[in-house]
């Protein structure tokens, strides 16, 4: 919260940009994933050449599915690596970029490939923790926001993207507190 206040105090015009839906230039999902894969190499261990496919959710399922998801491949083949994008979801280019960082590189796809290459004991495939898996991908979104700032020509681009990320983080904290309050403490 203090970081957001500090950024806005130094540059109050960023609030107008947030409200005016200032955005990244439009990019194709495949181009975003290629860029993310390249940028990931600076911050995380390299992966072997990884094949992946981007597909779109069928019209009949668009109403019921999330904005995007990574389809985990079978254990014995580790392929195919598929990311589905829901085209019915209205999102900004920045949201698409960070969603693909969550689902692709350095998110779920990266995590799955990296884990598989460690040749873990078979028991580790049987015991999974969705908290660990989603925790990693949510943590990774901060990198997605950092990487996205490289695509803004605006002088305030990195501050704008940082402020957007901080806003998302604050919202996730609020959701968590409400979830605990409602389901543990019985708030109504």
Question: Predicted regions: what is each one?
Answer:
Residues 1-188:
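N-terminal maturation segment of proteins
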């Amino acid at each position: 919260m203090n970081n957001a206040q500090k950024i806005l105090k130094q540059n109050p015009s960023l609030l107008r940009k947030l409200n005016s839906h200032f955005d990244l230039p439009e990019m194709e999902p495949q181009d975003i994933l290629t860029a993310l894969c390249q940028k990931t190499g600076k911050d995380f261990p390299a992966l072997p050449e990884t094949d992946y496919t981007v597909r779109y959710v069928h019209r009949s399922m668009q109403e019921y599915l999330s904005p995007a998801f990574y389809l985990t491949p079978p254990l014995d083949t580790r392929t195919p690596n598929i990311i589905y994008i829901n085209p019915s979801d209205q999102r900004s280019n920045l949201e698409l970029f960070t969603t693909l960082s969550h689902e692709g590189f350095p998110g779920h796809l990266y995590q799955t490939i990296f884990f598989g290459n460690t040749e873990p004991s078979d028991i580790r495939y049987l015991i999974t923790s969705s908290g660990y898996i989603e925790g990693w991908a949510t943590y990774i979104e901060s990198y997605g926001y950092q990487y996205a700032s490289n695509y803004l020509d605006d002088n305030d681009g990195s501050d704008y993207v940082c402020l957007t990320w901080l806003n998302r983080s604050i919202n996730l904290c609020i959701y968590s507190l409400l979830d605990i309050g409602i389901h543990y403490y019985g708030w109504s």
